[in-house]
A protein has these predicted regions:
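Transmembrane beta-strand segments of outer-membrane beta-barrel domains in Gram-negative
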Residues: 2-133, 219-221
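C-terminal outer-membrane beta-barrel translocator/porin domains of Gram-negative envelope proteins
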Residues: 2-19, 89-94, 98-206
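Extended interaction regions within the primary functional domain
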Residues: 3-8, 15, 56-59, 139-141, ...
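Feature targets compositionally biased, intrinsically disordered low-complexity regions
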Residues: 29, 43, 68, 141, ...
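Outer-membrane beta-barrel channels and translocator barrels
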Residues: 34-38, 81-83, 130-134, 201-205, ...
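Short alpha-helix boundary/capping motifs
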Residues: 58-59, 153-154, 224-225
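Outer-membrane beta-barrel transmembrane domain signature
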Residues: 136, 197, 201-209, 213-242
Length: 249
C-alpha cells in the first residue's frame, strides 16, 4: 500500500503492478424488514475466506496466507412520503417524490482463526425526478470508507461495486461506471462518487424521429469519482432505449 501511495497519479497503471495475490470465498446472510412506511432495516452477517492464489515467497514473507472475515452488518433505507397500495395483505411500494437515503454499516470481529477487525460505512442518496411526465433526471450520490482496520487489509465496498445498479432506474447503463477498471473498486479505503442520467424522447435524433420510430428514449449519462489516483475520474455517455434493448456509448 505504501508503494502504491508513492506512485504519481499520472503514471499509475494497474497493468504495471501485480495485485492478484488472494482468492476470496464470500457468503452474505441477511433479512430485510420494513419497520414503517418507507423505512427498511436489513440485518445480516458477512463472511470471507481468503487464501493466497499461488505460492509466492515474497508475499508469504510479509503477510499471512489466509485471512478470514466475520462481520455483522446493518443497512437502513429511508424514502420519505412513500406511496403504496395494498394487494390483499401485501404492501406494494410504487415510489415517492423524495430521495431514498441509505446507510450501510459493517463491523468485522476477530472471532475466527486468521481474522481481523475493521469497520465499513457507506452512505448514499438517489432519486428519479420526473419532468413534465415525459422527461426524467435520475441521480445517485454517495461515499464510503473503511476504518479501524487491524490485521485486515482488504476493502470490499457494497454500494460501490460494478455489479450494483441504483433501484428504479429505467436502464442498466446509467448509475454506474462502464469504463472503470474493476480493480479500482477495491483499491482504496475511501471514495466519493456521483452519477446522473437525463432521459427524454426528443434530443439529438429528433429531426429523424419518424425514420427511427423504434427508439423510445434518448439518454445522456454523467459520472464523477474521487479516490486516490483518481482525482477526479469522469465518464460521459449517450444512449438510446428501445422496446427490446438499451444501447450506449
Amino acid at each position: 500500500l505504501d508503494q502504491l501511495k508513492q506512485m504519481p497519479d499520472s503514471t499509475f497503471n494497474f497493468d504495471d503492478v501485480n495485485l492478484e495475490y488472494f482468492k476470496d470465498v464470500y457468503v452474505m446472510l441477511g433479512h430485510n424488514y420494513e419497520l414503517f412506511n418507507g423505512f427498511s432495516l436489513m440485518t445480516g452477517l458477512a463472511m470471507h475466506w481468503r487464501y493466497t492464489a499461488y505460492r509466492n515467497s515474497e508475499v508469504e514473507g510479509r503477510v499471512r496466507t489466509r485471512y478470514n472475515g466475520f462481520a455483522p452488518r446493518i443497512r437502513v433505507s429511508w424514502t420519505p412520503k412513500m406511496h403504496y397500495y395494498m394487494n390483499g395483505n401485501r404492501k406494494v411500494n410504487i415510489g415517492s417524490r423524495c430521495p431514498t437515503f441509505v446507510v450501510d454499516y459493517e463491523h468485522g470481529l476477530n472471532v475466527l482463526n486468521n481474522s481481523g477487525s475493521y469497520q465499513r460505512l457507506e452512505m448514499s442518496a438517489e432519486q428519479v425526478i420526473n419532468i413534465r411526465k415525459i422527461h426524467s433526471l435520475a441521480y445517485h450520490v454517495g461515499g464510503g470508507f473503511f476504518t479501524k482496520q487491524k490485521e485486515m487489509y482488504f476493502v470490499d465496498f457494497v454500494d460501490f461495486a460494478n455489479r450494483n445498479l441504483p433501484q428504479g432506474w429505467n436502464d442498466d447503463i446509467g448509475g454506474t461506471f462502464q469504463m472503470l477498471d474493476g480493480r479500482w473498486y477495491n483499491s482504496s479505503r475511501h471514495y466519493i462518487r456521483g452519477n446522473m442520467t437525463y432521459e427524454t424522447p426528443f434530443l439529438l435524433l429528433y429531426p429523424v424521429s419518424k425514420l427511427l420510430s423504434f427508439i423510445q428514449k434518448e439518454r445522456v449519462y454523467g459520472g464523477v469519482l474521487f479516490m486516490p489516483h483518481l482525482n477526479p475520474y469522469l465518464e460521459f455517455g449517450y444512449g438510446i432505449g428501445t422496446h427490446l434493448f438499451d444501447f450506449g456509448v
